């Protein structure tokens, strides 16, 4: 049995100490890291509860419940940040990526503790694939919110649309992972390739300007 709340405390403790030492300018980064790990912890409990209530099998829990719960939970601290602090557009995407990255980090650590770390090649691909998938979802949501929240009429519809896009991408990834075999490694490679293609496109556009 994996006591993920104990893992959470161990990972968050040094972040809290670092946040106190680094000063106010860096405080936002550490708070978003802690928020990302916190919503990952809560997502695990909610996923388990909903799977039990709905009597879902492993495939249904992985492909139908987990993507919806996890993407909604990752959105909550971001929406709180937007509503309370009303940040400028250029601060929204880094916040979303930080939450997504810390979510993926905590998820990977829990996976390693539960399943072992003896298969290096599998762990290597899973680490990059899962991390890139969560970061890609963070890029979609964060980049989109930076645009939609500057326009009042787009806030609600835009947020729902971006959440739906992130859930769909997450569900496709989880479905390929659950299928196994070659599809599993395609799933690991796909987010990495999409992130790389996006960065390359952004670099080319910046050079043209």
What label would you give each PLM region?
Residues 1-209:
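Hydrophobic alpha-helical segments at protein termini of multi-pass membrane proteins
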């Amino acid at each position: 049995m994996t006591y993920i709340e104990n893992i959470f405390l161990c990972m968050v403790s040094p972040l809290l100490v670092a946040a106190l030492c680094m000063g106010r300018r860096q405080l936002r980064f550490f708070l978003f890291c802690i928020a990302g790990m916190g919503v990952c912890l809560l997502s695990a409990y909610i996923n388990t509860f909903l799977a039990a209530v709905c009597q879902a099998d492993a495939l249904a829990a992985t492909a139908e419940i987990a993507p919806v719960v996890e993407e909604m939970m990752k959105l909550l601290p971001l929406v709180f940040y937007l509503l309370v602090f009303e940040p400028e557009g250029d601060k929204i995407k880094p916040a979303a990526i930080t939450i997504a990255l810390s979510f993926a980090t905590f998820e990977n650590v829990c996976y390693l503790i539960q399943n072992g770390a003896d298969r290096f090649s599998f762990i290597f691909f899973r680490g990059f694939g899962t991390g890139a998938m969560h970061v890609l979802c963070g890029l979609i949501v964060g980049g989109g919110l930076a645009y939609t929240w500057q326009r009042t009429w787009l806030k609600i519809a835009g947020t729902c649309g971006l959440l739906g896009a992130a859930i769909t991408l997450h569900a496709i990834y989880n479905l390929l992972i659950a299928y196994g075999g070659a599809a599993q490694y395609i799933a690991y490679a796909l987010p990495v390739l999409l992130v790389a293609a996006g960065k390359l496109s952004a670099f080319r556009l910046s050079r043209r300007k």
